[in-house]
Regions:
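Juxtamembrane regulatory segments of integral membrane proteins
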Residues: 749, 758-759
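Short cysteine clusters
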Residues: 741, 746-750
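Structured, non-catalytic alpha/beta "coupling" segments that mediate domain-domain communication
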Residues: 2-20, 317, 553-562, 568, ...
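Extended Lys/Arg-rich polyanion-binding regions
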Residues: 414-416, 422-436, 457-468, 484-485, ...
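Auxiliary Fe-S-binding modules of radical SAM enzymes
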Residues: 481, 743, 755-758
Length: 780
């Protein structure tokens, strides 16, 4: 491979491409090794030796030592740093030694055997870990996956005999905890719980998993009372994150030690910051639009593949991954007809054998280019890659580092490029690389106390075992009031010994781990009658309204009918050259203010709000150019959302003092609100679509100009609260992003929003910069 700096010229068609905004070099890192700990059985050391692992890295041993000594621990280091060895070592050693004791005295009943539970967010990652465990060929270790694909006979054998079980949170919630009496032997012996990819548990999903971990701990305590280890040790593997020990401690509800110094070797990585050029395509209000990240990334991928540079392009959506692959193939066919066959899309939804074949083709070099969703971001072992492209901000710095870490995995130098999408956050980051590399990685944000999440988990916990008064601390300070509310609603019955589940139906069914309520709506293929999938009711107005393009496993479907009464959406398979975006109008009411801070004449609040939203129309936009092809009205009912918000209050006098007149207030507030929504993911691990906003020159509850930004989930998800805590950093970045945009009057890269039901009108870019200056004047 050529030197990384020379590869920059391959990204574009000239040695100094105009789209290149900045170049940042991540320096190479040498390995720091440690000897094997004295407590590790020689058989375990020998097993790793057969795989070529002779001496572990320091961070692996630090984490393994902490877990072996009985302390909960999280290891938060980079991609390909060997985190799995850190949790495998104590777990396999405990299993191996306990099995050897059984073999040495087969006539004796042994009650102190050790077992391990491994949890991952995806079945694919669990399958890879299973292969890694089996590769060690330790005859004492009986490792098996336990998920929705496991047949009934195998489940019984796994419960009774497996000592290293790999599962996911969904199976723990639906299959294991509600049936804990079947698992009594397992829970009595459970020594370690491994939580892989812990940074992925954020937002509402993270809130659910946090309560799931508390339920797991109380079941373990029930079966472990009186044992030599009454509660298992939790070990987490995480991407780099801010305060990983604090975050994982909040996830499991217990103090945690952290190991975050990466001592594995890595070649240098040259990171290019790439902003697609403005085009002649005009969007709303005549604003110029940039070339899309999809089209730009496909161009770059074609350039790299034609130079035989092995490359992965990451993008968040399945449709985006498929589009990048198809455009790249078309471009390569014009250059060399042998090359299109060496490019493929990789996404979730493939059959296991298809996924394995793609991974092997990439490892062997048969494939030169892959466009992928985050399926490859997780810890699947793909090595020997030369370049990584990231199409659009992946959501968090942790995800970005996970993705660019795929290049140069075997220690060689590599190149990565961040290709900006046409939105405020990407605009800011591509012009401010220091916001990625010179600050700590963002915290993992979730709220276990969200009553819409905690309530159903309290019901599930009570169904598993009655909740005693001494357990209230485990579920947080709001749990007692919430339990009494559940009694009033008829879900629970209170007795002197605690709270009991009294309903005949499954309490676990009240919880949807990966969504936030509203009940599932079925997505049905109108031609075949087959069920394609389900969607939460709150999402349907945005993603499954009549006329919407719905994407399932890379295939596009046109929504023909949304039947809310029957909870059903009928779709028909199509092959469109456009996508759809819903637009809404919103009203907001302040219910309660929890926290406030004064910035001179500006007040920043955080608290409870009622948001009333109505989807009023949708736009069709060209896949490649983002050109608006048309807009159609929708007649959908308004919906209420009770959630959390942060809001900024400023009086007219302060705005007048900055030179603004009242006619400019609405456009300034509206533009600042849009940009602030786009920039919140900079400080909170949210997606732009997780949050919403409202601005008004005269709000009924404040009586003055106000900007609201709220969590788009019932009860909140922690994003707005993070915005309140980091408000100065957040608004400073918002102002800088608007300033950095080269447009004249506002565009999708700075102050326009694809969701705006007011057709991005009024917007005043210059006045928004002035307004943000007023808000920040006395910020602390």
């Amino acid at each position: 491979m050529a030197a990384p700096n020379s590869l920059i010229s391959l990204l574009g068609r000239t040695p100094d491409p105009e789209q290149l905004r900045h170049v940042h070099t991540i320096p190479a890192r040498k390995a720091v090794n440690e000897p094997w700990p004295h407590w590790v059985h020689p058989d375990i050391v020998d097993a790793y030796g057969t795989l070529g692992i002779q001496e572990p890295y320091r961070h692996q041993i630090q984490a393994a030592d902490l877990a072996h000594s009985g302390q909960h621990v999280v290891i938060a280091t980079g991609t390909a740093s060997g985190k799995s060895l850190a949790y495998q070592l104590p777990a396999l050693d405990a299993i191996h030694r306990s099995e050897l004791r059984v073999l040495s005295d087969p006539g004796k009943i042994h009650d102190d055997g050790a077992v391990t539970l491994y949890l991952s967010p995806t079945k694919a990652l669990a399958a890879d870990q299973l292969a890694a465990i089996r590769a060690l060929k330790l005859p004492t270790v009986r490792a098996e996956t336990y998920d929705g694909d496991t047949d009934v006979a195998s489940r019984r054998w796994i419960r009774d005999h497996a000592n290293f079980i790999l599962a996911n949170p969904d199976m723990l919630h639906f299959g294991i905890l509600p049936n804990h009496t079947w698992w009594a032997r397992f829970f009595r012996r459970l020594r370690y719980v491994i939580v892989d990819e812990a940074h992925s548990y954020r937002g509402v999903f993270g809130s659910h998993v946090a309560n799931l971990m508390r339920r797991l701990r109380r079941i373990c305590a029930y079966y472990g009372a009186g044992n030599s280890f009454p509660e298992p040790i939790f070990i987490a593997a995480s991407a780099t994150a801010s305060d990983p020990g604090v975050s994982f401690g909040r996830l499991i509800g217990a103090p945690v030690r952290e190991v975050s110094e990466d001592c594995s070797p890595h070649g240098s990585t040259t990171v290019a910051f790439w902003e697609p050029a403005l085009t002649d395509v005009r969007g709303e209000n005549g604003a110029k639009q940039r070339r899309t990240a999809v089209a730009e990334t496909a161009d770059i991928l074609a350039n790299l593949v034609s130079s035989r540079v092995r490359t992965i392009a990451f993008i968040k959506s399945r449709r985006g991954a498929e589009s990048i692959a198809s455009i790249t193939k078309r471009l390569l066919d014009e250059v060399d007809p042998s090359l299109p066959g060496r490019v493929a899309a990789y996404r979730s939804g493939y059959l296991p054998e298809e996924r394995r074949a793609l991974e092997q083709a990439l490892r062997s070099g048969q494939l030169l280019g892959v466009s992928s969703t985050s399926a490859l971001e997780l810890g699947i072992d793909i090595s020997g890659l030369d370049a990584v492209l990231v199409a659009g901000w992946p959501g968090t710095r942790a995800s970005l580092f996970q993705q660019i870490g795929r290049a140069g995995r075997a220690g060689q130098d590599a190149i990565a490029a961040f290709v900006a999408s046409d939105d405020p956050l990407d605009t800011y980051l591509v012009n401010h690389p220091e916001a990625i590399f010179d600050v700590s990685v963002e915290a993992t944000v979730f709220d276990p106390g969200n009553p819409y999440v905690l309530g159903p988990h309290l019901c599930a916990a009570a169904a598993e075992l009655p909740i005693g008064p001494g357990e209230l601390d485990l579920f947080g300070p709001t749990s007692e009031d919430l339990l009494d509310r559940l009694v009033d609603q008829g879900y629970l019955r209170k007795r002197p010994a605690g709270w009991f589940w009294t309903h005949p139906e499954s309490a676990a069914g009240m919880v949807n781990l990966r969504a936030d309520g509203g009940g599932p709506v079925s997505i049905v293929d109108a031609e075949t009658g087959s069920l394609l999938g389900t969607m939460d009711s709150p999402q349907t107005h945005y993603q499954a309204h009549t006329g919407a393009i719905y994407v399932h496993q890379g295939e596009s479907y046109l929504v023909e009918d949304l039947n809310e009464a029957d909870h059903c959406v009928m779709v028909r398979r199509v092959n469109p050259d456009f996508y759809t975006t819903a637009r809404d109008v919103t009203q907001i009411e302040v219910l309660e203010t929890s926290r406030s801070v004064q910035w001179g004449d500006v007040t920043v609040h955080f608290g409870d709000v009622k948001v009333t939203t109505q989807v009023v129309s949708f736009q069709r936009k060209a896949l490649i150019s983002n050109e608006i092809l048309g807009e159609e009205p929708l007649e959908l009912g308004a919906r209420d959302l009770f959630t959390k918000a942060v809001w900024f209050v400023v009086d007219n006098r302060s705005l007048h003092g900055a030179g603004l007149v009242e006619a400019e207030f609405p456009g300034a507030l509206h533009a600042a609100e849009h940009a602030a929504i786009g920039l919140l993911p900079l400080v909170a691990s949210s997606d732009r679509w997780d949050i919403g906003g409202v601005s008004t020159a005269l709000h009924a509850d404040t009586g003055v100009p106000t900007i609201f930004v709220y969590d788009g989930h019932p009860g909140g998800a922690g994003f707005a609260e993070r915005g309140f805590e980091k408000a100065k950093i957040w608004l400073t970045a918002t102002r800088d992003a608007i300033k950095a945009c080269e447009c004249d009057n506002g565009c999708p890269s700075c102050v326009q929003s694809p969701k705006c039901g007011n057709k991005n009108n009024p917007l005043d870019k210059a006045a928004a910069i002035t307004l943000l200056g007023v808000l920040l004047k006395d910020a602390t």
